[in-house]
Each structure stands twice: as C-alpha cells, then as structure tokens.
C-alpha cells in the first residue's frame, strides 16, 4: 500500500455523494488515525462526550495494528464506500 493510494482514498472519502453511516465513519476515522498517528496517545474523553468516546474507543481497538495494515484496511473500506455511496 503506497502513501499516494492512502492519500487519494483520504481525499475521495470527502467527496462521497452520501454521508456514510456512523459505524462506517468510525471505521474510517479509527483506521486513518492508526495509519497516521499510530497507537492512541490521548486520554479517553469525559463521560458527557459521547461522540469523542466512541471515536476514542474505535481507535483504541486498533492498538498494535501496523501502519501498513491500517492503511490497507482504510483504502479497502473507502473503495467499498465509493461503490456503495458514489463519488
């Protein structure tokens, strides 16, 4: 998986005709963060930040996943979303 393919997928996902479902967006977010930052490096958000906690939990589940694997999963998911929602 090349950085260029990953960067293209990151741009493509911004131009989907329809916004993906929340679970799909969490998948995209968590794999993007794992590919670009690595293992989670922040504290879990507070009790009232439900959206922040969901994003944190999704990213935290990928702890230990390699950058390459996260990039590959991200690009594959974006390709699926492009077929499902159009671009």
UniProtKB/Swiss-Prot annotation:
Species, as recorded: Canis lupus familiaris (Dog)
Cellular localisation: Endoplasmic reticulum; Golgi apparatus
Main localisation: endoplasmic reticulum
N6-malonyllysine: residues carrying this PTM: 55
GO BP terms: fatty acid metabolic process
Keyword Cytoplasm set for record: no
Protein name listed in UniProt: Acyl-CoA-binding protein
Binding positions for an acyl-CoA per the UniProt entry: 14, 29-33, 55, 74
Chain positions found as Phosphotyrosine: 29
Entry's family note: Belongs to the ACBP family.
């Amino acid at each position: 998986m090349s950085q260029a393919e990953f960067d293209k997928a990151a741009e493509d996902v911004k131009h989907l005709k329809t916004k993906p479902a929340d679970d799909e967006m969490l998948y995209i977010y968590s794999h993007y963060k794992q590919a670009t930052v690595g293992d989670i490096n922040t504290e879990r958000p507070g009790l009232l930040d439900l959206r922040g906690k969901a994003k944190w939990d999704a990213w935290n589940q990928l702890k230990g996943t390699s950058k390459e694997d996260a990039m590959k999963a991200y690009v594959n998911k974006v390709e699926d979303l492009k077929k499902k929602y159009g671009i």
